[in-house]
Amino acid sequence: MTAVADTNQHYDLDPDIFGQFLDPLRKYSAARYDAEHDTLESAQRNKLRFVADRLGLRGGERLLDVGCGWGSLILYMASELGCRTTGISPAPRQHGYIAEQAAARGVAELVETKVGHFERLDLPARGFDAVTLLGSIVHMPDPDEVFRRAKTVLRRGGTLYVSESCFRNTATRTAFDDRDGTGFVREDIFGFGELRPLSELIAAAENAGFSITSVDDLTDDYRRTIADWIANVDAAAARIDAHGPGLAAKLRHYLEIANAGWGYTTKHYALVCRNAR
């Protein structure tokens, strides 16, 4: 699928690049700042605990993370809660990194990964207690198919957690979808990305048969997360540029565009759904 191959232009870059500006867990999505003194590292751990709480995890559950990145969520849930985790990513380099980290943490038997596209992979029906998509649906062409697939692999009573950046509303999407900044992020950074209004994601979830249990506005948290990333990019610019001249400036430009839109054109939400039947 073209969208999967295109997103690899960003996510399959050398993992060391992301290690220069992300937290030690290399979590590449919004953190959660519970206090003014929270660092990026502590805020990302806060966020992982928040996800576990929203999912109602108690330990030992079967969890599927779609768009698992460098494994921050599955490694955390395996290490802290003993969950049996599966991560999906189209970027081969991420899988090698996760395997190394799982072995180093002593949780290799609880962590597996699959290279490919969620809608196309062979996954067990009702095989998971929880499914997570953190910043993943933006890279998937058909959200209706994503939610239908998530319902298929969740057990009855299982929980789906989705966090995603969204246009504020349909009118904003119409006005800004073709702007230069939107095109730069979509094409020059990710290769494929499609911001949608929250209403479209909720409709897709409900049409798939999910019950919505909560919606959280995490926009301010993502604004602060990206500000911390920008500071780290600036501090590590020379090391980042060692992987390609001008790469640090390109990353900074992308992050600045993202932060300029919060509350004006874009929001970031956490949506929790239950597979009630």
What are these regions (language model features)?
Residues 1-19:
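N-terminal auxiliary segments of SAM/dcSAM-dependent transferases
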Residues 60-67:
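Conserved class I S-adenosyl-L-methionine
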Residues 70-81:
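Conserved SAM-binding loop of SAM-dependent methyltransferases across substrates and taxa
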Residues 84-89:
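Conserved SAM-binding motif I beta-strand of class I
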Residues 106-120:
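Conserved SAM-binding strand-loop segment of SAM-dependent methyltransferases
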Residues 119-131:
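A short acidic, Gly/Pro-enriched loop at the edge of an enzyme's catalytic core
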Residues 144-159:
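A short glycine-rich, Lys/Arg-flanked "PGG" loop and its adjoining helix->strand segment in the class I
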Residues 166, 172-268, 274-277:
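Substrate-binding/catalytic lobe of Class I Rossmann-like enzymes that use SAM or dcSAM, i.e.
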